Amino acid sequence: MILSNLKPVPGARHSKKRLGRGPGSGTGKTSGKGHKGQKARSGGGVRPGFEGGQIPFFQRIPKRGFNNHTRVEYAIVNTKELNVFEDGTVVTPELLLQTKLVSKVLAGVKILADGKLEKKLTVKANKFSNSAKEAIEAAGGTIEVI
């Protein structure tokens, strides 16, 4: 097999439509746009969501909720996920990024207590749930709020 000799399978590629090239082409004269009207004109057509003057659907539906611009979002890590580390490891947000337990550190890392922690670790994070603190200390580890 030579890469320069490869050809597409017959029927896999379509030839380009040549518009406005005489009646024999099948797309001559009006070029598939029909006769007159808004959609036949240059730049013609209606904007997305336009319903002919009737109140559009997106305006008929009531507005809901709001975006809280002061919201602080933390990357979440559960205690069961910390079992991948060896005993005595100092777990930091940087280490969690390296081991891909978090994809990105948003406003920081928060540790939650889902699952059982079986390793003795020193965990450094921005926030801890009360049950996560208890779980880490019950396993013999220590916590440190950054």
Swiss-Prot record:
Question: Compositionally biased, Gly residues: which spans?
Answer: 21-31, 42-52
* Residue span of region Disordered: 1-53
Gene3D superfamilies under this entry?
Answer: 3.100.10.10
Return one GO MF term.
Answer: structural constituent of ribosome
A biological process term (GO) from this entry: translation
Task: Give the record's keywords alphabetically.
Answer: Ribonucleoprotein, Ribosomal protein, RNA-binding, rRNA-binding
Q: Which GO terms describe its cellular component?
A: cytosolic large ribosomal subunit
Query: Looking at the keywords, is Transmembrane helix present?
Result: no
Look up keyword Protein biosynthesis and say if it applies.
Answer: no
SUPFAM superfamilies reported for this sequence: Ribosomal proteins L15p and L18e (SSF52080)
**Family assignment from sequence similarity:** Belongs to the universal ribosomal protein uL15 family.
What is known about its subunit structure? Part of the 50S ribosomal subunit.
User: What job does the chain carry out?
Assistant: Binds to the 23S rRNA.
Q: What name goes with this protein?
A: Large ribosomal subunit protein uL15
According to its UniProt entry, this protein's organism is Acholeplasma laidlawii (strain PG-8A)
